[in-house]
């Protein structure tokens, strides 16, 4: 990247970005671990794109993202480790082609290096989660069932392995019979 990126440290709260265009960095936005009962960041009508690392890296904090695009990251477009998150009307799309891509559109975990990070909530409403891979969601759930891992997808288009449960409602799974790659057709 040509510069680092935006970082919100542990003691930083009530940050609000509207109409931001963040691109060309080593990462996009990084939010350090903090209390999940207080809002760390609200991101609205913004773009995070073409970064060499993670686009939006959130660790055990509370963040709301609306009407935004996070795309083309060398690692993950969005990386969630524990916390409380809501994404509404967002596009997470990883078609990164400037180097070897090491991630997916969405990574969700509740444990790292044997340390628990409860995922109290990760809600995705009316979102597109896509990319050039066959599975653009990577989940890392702890073997310890007592560590919260709560997610919900509603009215989304998802490029991932189809899954059915009560946490996935009215989702369209990206398949050959649902969509056509226009680059291959004239």
Regions found by a protein language model. Name each.
Residues 1-186:
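Beta-strand/loop edge motif enriched in small/polar residues
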